Amino acid sequence: MEKRDSRPLYAAALTAAAVVLAVRAMYGFCWSDESFYLTFAQRLWNGQKLILDEWHPVQFYSALFYPILSLYHVLFGNRGIYLFAREVYVALAFGTAMLLYRTLCRKCAPFTSFLCAGLFLCYSRGNIWGLSYYNLFLTFCLLFACSALRKRPWAWCLGGVCLAAAVLCVPYFALFVIPGLIAALCIPKLRKRAGWTASGICILAAVFLLFFLPKDIGGVLASLKEILSDPEHSGGPVHYLAAAIRDVKLLYYYEALLTAFAGAVLLLGVKLLPKRFGALPGLLVAACGAVVSLWRYRNGELGFAYYQFAIFCLPAMALCWVKREISRPALLLRILGIAMGLSMAMSSNTEAITFTVGLPVYSMGVLVQLSALPREAAEVQLRRFGAVLACVVLCLSFASRITSVFRDGPLNTLTEPMTSGPAAGIRTTREHAEQYAGILAMLEELEDTYSSENRIFFTSILPWGYLATDFPCGAPTAWRTKLDSPQLESYCETHPMPAIVVVLEPQVGASPDKPMLNENSFSGRFWEKLQADYTPLEYPYATVYLSPNAILKGV
């Protein structure tokens, strides 16, 4: 009897998951991170420049999505741009998942390929739905992996473009890309492939340098000094990496001990017991540990379940190493995942959460490795263990992706649709909808009165405000900037003072984990200048300070 081809069924399952995600993207309004990522492209749209006008360290990747957001601006203005960016990412993630699935189907079983694609599709750092640099970094790294696993020069060149895009998302990734590329160029068997990859890197680098890097070298160097002194990233890469490792040790100390014990039991069982039962005791210990650990962190960050998969599959990987069963595609994915995790850990101050960006790729490498094992008794048990654990992680991650909400109320409270402005088409809580409508009305009044040449500054944080108007950003970054920020004072020494300063009420944009999102500090030279020279206007959710030099519309 001919075996039925299961590949279309798995492709249909991925498609159904993407449709669910596309619908879910219409719920939940994040007042901070998600819109902040879009402000980089908004600054370019308003005629400002990277580095010279924007002082946040993660700005470079905006060059990747600036063209498509600019096209949206031309066609539709700013209305609904928030939801548009979400759906663009869902479409990009779905396309990448399908490409990954088709690529891996050539290397391993369809079910393994489906699990790998599903693990990617269900992951989003922090459950942020938009074009975050975390998500795009993961996407471009997987696109590189898909290209590297093909045998065509054009695919290798395209992989180089994706690798360069990943470096724009996380610049510290270059610390792994450059040595890896040099090493590949030194190996005769890989030299041609590495040469084509390098050409792809050079293509995107040339585009970025030509169209996005300011030509004022002196100004760039001076601004880089300020960017590197960013108060939220002043610890340095080594400090952040060490902090992330310490955090993982604290969180998963008992899991590490248990998986070491499971590994010892597994190796001894394979050596001493009959082949049919040799792997079972060790795998049973690992399975029990995984279940307990998954339950322990069931309410943790989306992506933490990947830790359990990686940790409790270590005994199985150790057995593969002992038996010298090495799959090259699996090795590529595991090395890539480790490099991604380390790069993110050096780039971010969010400790253990940072490694979760690389863990899906590492987990794919584990699954592909287990799928490549010969069909013997112990190896079959390893494959089944990995597949079952991956299914559990996949289901938990998908459920968390749907039910958890980042910086908004619980899912069942997201009932109020927003019908205008950048967040049009998204549903949020009644309180947030009222705040949004009130602030949007205030901004429309300001736009009707004052010229778009005036710079605006929202404090402490309201990134979507910059998306709602044509006023250029008058702050070093749209990220959290308080009135007493030393970086704000330095910025105003080299840039014009903002003509419009919006001081938000502390409770604006509040969420369960951030009850006072816009708490401020009313001190410093900038605040003193506002008090002395600016005219205050009271609004329901903010106080607006107007400069005497503010330009009226039509003047």
Give residue spans per PLM region.
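Hydrophobic alpha-helical membrane-interfacial segments at the cytosolic entry of transmembrane helices
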Residues: 11-17, 190-214, 247-264, 275-289, ...
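Short hydrophobic/aromatic helix or loop-helix immediately within or flanking a transmembrane segment
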Residues: 38-42, 53-77, 87, 166
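Short periplasmic/luminal acceptor-recognition loop of GT-C membrane glycosyltransferases, typified by
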Residues: 56, 401-481, 497-509, 540-546
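Transmembrane-helix signature of polytopic, membrane-embedded enzymes
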Residues: 95-122, 154, 278
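Membrane-interface alpha helices of multi-pass inner-membrane proteins
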Residues: 125, 142, 147, 155-171, ...
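Short acidic/glycine- and proline-prone juxtamembrane loop motifs at membrane-interface regions
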Residues: 128-137
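Specific aromatic-rich, kink-prone transmembrane helix
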Residues: 136-156, 161-163, 309-317, 362-365
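Perimembrane helix-loop-helix junctions
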Residues: 176-206, 268-272, 372-376
